[in-house]
Amino acid sequence: SGKSYNLQSLTVGTTEDETISRMTIGVSSDDITFEQIKKQLNSMVEVIKVIDLTNVPIHMKEILFAKVLGCNVEQKAEIFQIAQVFGVQVEDIGSDSVLLECKLTERRNNELIALLKEKYKRIEVVRGGAVAIESISTSCR
């Protein structure tokens, strides 16, 4: 029908079978558009199966790197505390910068970015797409 939509996230990687890749696609759309997207994906010859994880318990994480630039010693100590609270890794440290590696839910990553933007003048953020798998017992969105 020519309706357009925007991908929020796209991640592709090999699976336990090296001849098969798994694609995790994140979209925000109305129900009609979402059904259209699923139909389009299912009609592609290379697609083995489309799994809709909208209403099932899942585990989902997104990788993110956040670099805080131009920080002094006190700010670096504060960033270490923030990293501890959020459960993220301090990946690298420079004389006036700190690099954080985050593997959190999209919502938690957004909260971290908002906090860093609020507290520090110069930050650089790189996000990878989310990956998701159906949960065995609990959900982590």
What are these regions (language model features)?
Residues 1-22, 29-141:
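Long, contiguous binding/interaction regions
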